[in-house]
Amino acid sequence: MILLLSLVTFVLLARAFRSLLLPLKAVALVLVSVATAWGFMTVVWQDGHGSALWGISATGSITAFVPVMVFAFLFGISMDYEVFLLARMREEYDVHGSTDAAVVAGIGSTGRLVTSAALILCLAFAALASAPEVSIKIIATGLAAGIVIDATIIRMLLVPSLISLLGRWNWWLPAGVARLLRVESSPIRIELEEEEPLVRSA
C-alpha cells in the first residue's frame, strides 16, 4: 500500500511540477516524517519511555490499525504542506529562473502559514490525547509528534537545504518523460536554450 501510494504521488507531482527530483524528494521526506512518528509511538507507548505522563504503563505492543491510521493522516497532511511550498517555489522559478530566489520566496510566503497550521493541528491532537482510549492516545500523540517534526525540521530546514544544494537539477525533466506525462517544457528552460547560441557567438 505504501509503495503504491508513493508511486502514484510521485507521478502526480512529477506532472504538476515538471520535475523528477522534486517529487522524489517530496515523497522521501514525507516518509521520513511518518517513520519518525512511528518511532515516537514505539519508544513512548510500546517501550514505555514517557507513557507515564498519561498515567499508563508500557503497552508492549501497538494495535495493528494504529500505524495505518497515523500513516494515512500524516502522509496527507505532510504532502499538503510540501505541495503548498513547492508550488510557490515553482512559480517563482518560472518567473526569475533562480533556485535560490525560489527558495527564499517559497519559505518567506508559506513558512508562517505552514507553521500556524501545524501548531493548530498539534494542539488539537494534544487535546485528543486526553481521550480515555489508549489507541486514540497513541494515534494523537504520534500525529502531534510527526506534525511538529515535519513542520520544523523537515519543511523549514531539510526541504530548502536540499533544493538549494540540487540547484538547477530540481527542475530537470527529460524530454521523453515530459512527453509521457503530457506536460510542456519549462518556459524558463526554453528561453535559456534559445539564448545560449547568442552568448557563444558574442
Regions found by a protein language model. Name each.
Residues 1-202:
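Membrane-embedded transmembrane helical bundles of large multi-pass transporters/channels
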